[in-house]
């Protein structure tokens, strides 16, 4: 590689220039283990208890837990390099979710996608989610869901916490 440098010191009316060419940009880690597997994917809508075919509201929250030793690919650099959700196989209902991926703190191998789906019509739908790792191995997961208009969330537990603030 080559980097050309230029600097100016307005206070002393001086200029400087230079170059640096002793670096490599790109390449491959020779010690990397190629597992040839896509990311582990756990997907649910609204609740971790979701199973394929469950009932959901019109705007369910899609949550996807991802893990891969090579890291999760969110580069968005062409086909297969995005986190994608597709509803009912429709191109018009394809959502790129790269911007909704958050890595676990200090861990490039794991993270979560959290995205509220746009309003869906009442009835049965399918959702396909695709994720790839940094070695371009992909995993695709499909689930079915049934949208029920006006469905209210299930409240599983209500708790209170003492406020630490006082006068």
Protein language model features and the residues they cover:
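Short, surface-exposed ligand- or partner-binding patches at beta-edge/loop junctions that are enriched
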Residues: 1-4
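Long, low-complexity serine/threonine/glycine- and acidic-rich segments characteristic of extracellular
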Residues: 6, 12-26, 42-49, 63-149
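Short, compositionally biased P/S/T/A/G/V-rich stretches that sit at domain boundaries
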Residues: 27-60, 146-167
């Amino acid at each position: 590689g080559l980097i050309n440098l230029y600097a100016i010191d307005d206070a002393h009316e001086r200029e400087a220039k230079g170059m640096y060419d002793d670096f490599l940009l790109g390449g491959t880690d020779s010690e990397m283990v190629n597992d040839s597997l896509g990311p582990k994917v756990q997907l649910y809508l609204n609740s971790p208890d979701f199973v394929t075919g469950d009932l959901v509201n019109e705007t369910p929250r899609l949550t996807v837990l991802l893990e891969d030793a090579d890291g999760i690919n969110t580069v968005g650099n062409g086909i297969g390099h995005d986190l994608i959700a597709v509803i009912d196989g429709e191109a018009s209902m394809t959502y790129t979710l790269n911007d909704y991926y958050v890595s676990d703190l200090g861990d490039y191998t794991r993270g979560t996608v959290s995205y509220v789906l746009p309003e869906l019509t009442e009835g049965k739908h399918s959702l396909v989610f695709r994720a790839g790792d940094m070695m371009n191995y992909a995993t695709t997961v499909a689930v079915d869901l049934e949208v029920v208009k006006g469905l209210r969330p299930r409240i599983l537990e209500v708790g209170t916490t003492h406020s630490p603030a006082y006068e």
